[in-house]
A protein has these predicted regions:
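Conserved catalytic cores of very large enzyme subunits
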Residues: 1-303, 316
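Single conserved hydrophobic/aromatic residue that forms the stacking wall/gate
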Residues: 308-315
Length: 316
């Protein structure tokens, strides 16, 4: 059920915006324990009804088999629904799935998250069948796997997941990798604490932000980008004719143009009522504003971002 609702939310959110979105498997992991408790109760009742005399250990063993099967079906649902659902823009949702073990507390929840990550990687290695019945690499969801102390060495607890991720990358060119150690050095908040978190969709990384409305706790989920502008550095170089002074002059002109383009996005969004995309602005995907309230207060400060990309290649 959690996986089904997640994919429905993905499709609806994608229909209300441009660009990608990211979800974390850490947010699905707690539901594994709910299923486990349900199956333990269910198996115990079935054994009692059929006259099977089994101890608690055997009941848990059978329940665990059902948990594994439910994880498999849930992950499969996400993969196939994402590539078959169409947004109102007429395309599959651009979604990234984040796999970070340390995002949940150590214990059963982390063990359950590891099970979900393992199943995601196994299914991506297998791929999906196209209309001709051939196993292919799906474009989405994109996968990001975090390298951390628990999975980077052969004697690490979750080394098997990193091996599986490497096998998946060799065959399917995903997942991409984030180093927790390096990212925590680069993404440091105003209190000097480093953080590891997913990019927004394919590539845009947020700056650290501590939410004053929530005891200054770090906030990364539920934030957004106002718009992206790309600067073609190769074109700037070619236009300069190998003259460095001319290169810097052209670059300054292009950067000013990029700034104007980014501000156009900002001014265009000002005054937008939350009613234009209720799932984003009213129902919690990005905020919980009142009906009729404008989104203006979300367009200022560090909660949102604007992005300037640089292109290093040329299209022929």
């Amino acid at each position: 059920t959690a996986c089904n609702i997640a994919t429905q939310a993905i499709a609806q959110i994608a229909s209300s915006q441009y660009g990608g979105q990211s979800i974390s498997l850490a947010h699905l992991a707690p539901f594994v324990q709910i299923s486990r408790e349900k199956f333990i109760k269910q198996v115990a009742e079935e054994f009692k009804a059929t006259g099977i005399d089994a101890g608690e250990d055997k009941i848990k063993e059978v329940a665990e088999l059902r948990v594994r099967d439910e994880i498999k079906r849930g992950v499969q649902m996400i993969q196939y629904q994402v590539i078959t659902l169409m947004t109102t823009n007429g395309q599959a949702p651009f979604v990234t799935v984040f796999m970070y073990l340390d995002e949940v507390p150590e214990g059963q929840t982390r063990e359950d998250l590891a099970l979900v990550i393992e199943e995601v990687l196994k299914q991506r290695i297998q791929g999906v069948k196209n209309e001709k019945g051939v196993w292919i690499t799906p474009a989405f969801p994109k996968l990001i796997y975090v390298l951390e102390e628990d999975n980077i060495r052969e004697d690490s607890k979750y080394w098997n997941l990193t091996q599986l991720a490497a096998k998946c990358t060799a065959k399917r060119m995903v997942p991409d990798y984030i180093s927790e150690k390096i990212m925590k050095k680069l993404k440091v908040d105003k209190f000097g604490e480093g953080h590891c978190f997913p990019c927004m969709g394919c590539r845009s990384f947020l700056t650290p932000y501590n939410d004053p409305e929530n005891d200054n706790k770090p906030k990364y989920y539920g934030r957004f980008n106002q718009g992206v502008v790309t600067l073609n550095l190769v074109d700037v170089a070619c236009s300069s004719g190998k003259d460095m002074d001319k290169f810097w002059k052209i670059l300054d002109e292009r950067l000013e143009l990029c700034k104007r383009a980014l501000m156009c996005r900002h001014y265009r969004l000002k005054g937008t009522p939350s009613d234009v995309a209720p799932i984003l602005w009213q129902n919690g995907a990005l905020a919980r504003l009142k009906k009729g309230e404008t989104i203006d207060k979300l367009l200022y400060g560090d909660r949102k971002s604007t992005r300037l990309n640089s292109s290093h290649g040329k299209l022929s």
